Amino acid sequence: IWNITARHEAGHLPERRRMTVLNVLSLGAGVQSSVMALMAAHGELPIPDCAIFADTQWEPQGVYDHLDWLQSVITSPLLVGNTFPIYRVTAGNIYEDAISGVNSTGTAFATLPFFSLGNVMARRQCTNEYKIKPIRQKIRSLLGLKKGQRVPKDKSVKQWIGISTDEASRMKPSRDKWCENIFPLIEKQMSRRDCMTWFEKRYPGRVLAKSACKGCPFNDDKRWRDMKLNQPNDFAEVVNFDEKIRKPRNNFDREFFIHSSRQPLSKVDFRNLEDKGQINMFENECEGMCGV
């Protein structure tokens, strides 16, 4: 799958006239994509031309701290010949857009998959609007293309996606003919646990952050509970957000909730079975499915 014909020097992309295949690592700053980037920096994967992180502007501070650390490692002078630039792009502030009821283009939609009474769920547009599109726009910019310009036949892109073997069902082809999605961790036959083991061996004591928006409706009770106990300021911010999305806005006349129980987040009981005096016979495992 590796066909890197263009390499960068000193953190810059190669000259466009020499570039036929642009290798881009899609960086979610979660476990899999972080390990994928570090494996390249350690020489265990080919070197991509760049990595791109799409910022929703509402990630937990731990994600931004991790991204800063990751960037310092990957661009370190100690990694002679194995460094590559990390670009940060954004389509706007998903927190503000969700409250106002618009998406990144100003169209009136509830971009997050909020819950509503009557077993209704809003359309999930956030990944496409705030992750996929800004990365695609940056790729087109790196190819030297203007808005609406077609990708020349002599240029193509291989986009590295951090999906591991335990998530193989999430593998999808690119929607663009000029772009091919490739899955280095699948090729390496690495699971999420394998990624964690790789990271713990090389960076003992450092914790990999889970990458997801603070107020993602797909958070489970374990994650909400952890936020309430350990990041009270973030939890208070999300509670305030949850209250605001119940106010009618634009063309939405129904009440939305951030929690699947369809009750205010401030009133949800996140206690686990042990907290309630019962024995928990199961392990609740949270898997973030957005930023790998």
Regions found by a protein language model. Give the residues of each.
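Nucleotide-activated chemistry modules centered on ATP-dependent adenylation/adenylyltransferase
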Residues: 2-5, 13-292
